[in-house]
Amino acid sequence: MFERICLIVLDGVGIGELPDAIEYDDIGAHTLGNIYKTRGKLDLPNLYAMGLGNIENSRLPSVQKPTAAYGRMAQLTRAKDTTCGHWELMGHVMDPPFKTFKEFPEKVLNEWLQLANMPKAWLGNYPASGTAIIDKLGEEHMKTGAPIVYTSADSVFQIAAHEAIIPLSTLYKLCEIARKLLVGDLFVGRVIARPFVGAPGAFKRTENRKDYAVPPTGKTLLDALETQGKTTLGIGKIEDIFCKRGVKHVNHTTNNSDSIAATIDALKFNNEDTLIFTNLIDFDMKYGHRNDPDGFGQALEAFDGQLPKIINALRPVDLLILTSDHGCDPTTKHTDHTREYVPLLAYGANIKPTDLGTRTTFADIAATIYANFGLGKWHMGESLW
């Protein structure tokens, strides 16, 4: 049994299209493989040593003797968004998934702004890349003060606003009101504040993003661990994804560098019976959605460079799991998430390097952690060993 488990989610790092990718307009998606192909290289010596390239159809360099157990996981939830991906990792499959929209009803937007005591005027209200829509509508937004509303192929209601035009406190209030409205037939997974700064032609999104999710619609591993008195620590946006439910301790970091540092610190000081649950957001947010394979590759290489520090912070009784929540292939024709398998690497002093094969659900992670802490069999998924 492992006394501590560190689960790190490399947000948006997929490893090849799922069989149903055609239903999501994602034929040919392969986040890691296409980044490698586009750049001509991907310098990840530590991840390769663990066995990343040994995973089926990885399209990456393999090694003779991997140091970790390796495999890939399919998503059972019929979705490709962050919330559903993380919930499934924690053993809950949402069925049916959240609703997606091409546009939001005018009646709802009017009610939203009325409740916020703002003029009934908005910009956008269509699927778009976050950086593209502020480039297109940012100047008009600065002139009119109207918030920019947009969505994507995921279940999101996103509100972009210049911090000098709509203060953060007001933007967050707008999000809170929208979150209360978008339920029932309008059940959206996340409302997201997307603040930006700068002048026309040079707008830049800030790290003051804030996500407004809904509590999981069923019991998750985090709930079970909390009930059993285990310690849980959420790093990055984990608390937002689960609405703090089952997350005893929180370190709300906003970028990969800070999240990695927080994870290493947690490994140095946390005691036994602990789950450290980290989300690394930059791959997805800064590069995947912006169709930037070179930036994505550099971010992967930067993580690989920090990986030895994480490994060195592990104790002999620790387990490190690296995986993802969905794909976000930066080489696709769209800027949305991609329906892909996700990589799975499990490393520890007591782990026998082996091929874990193709898992049928992300919930195998929850089943593994639940069994590890001596709590029995999770209601879905199979333990990795």
Predicted regions and their residues:
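Feature captures the catalytic ectodomains and active-site-proximal regions of enzymes
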Residues: 1-385
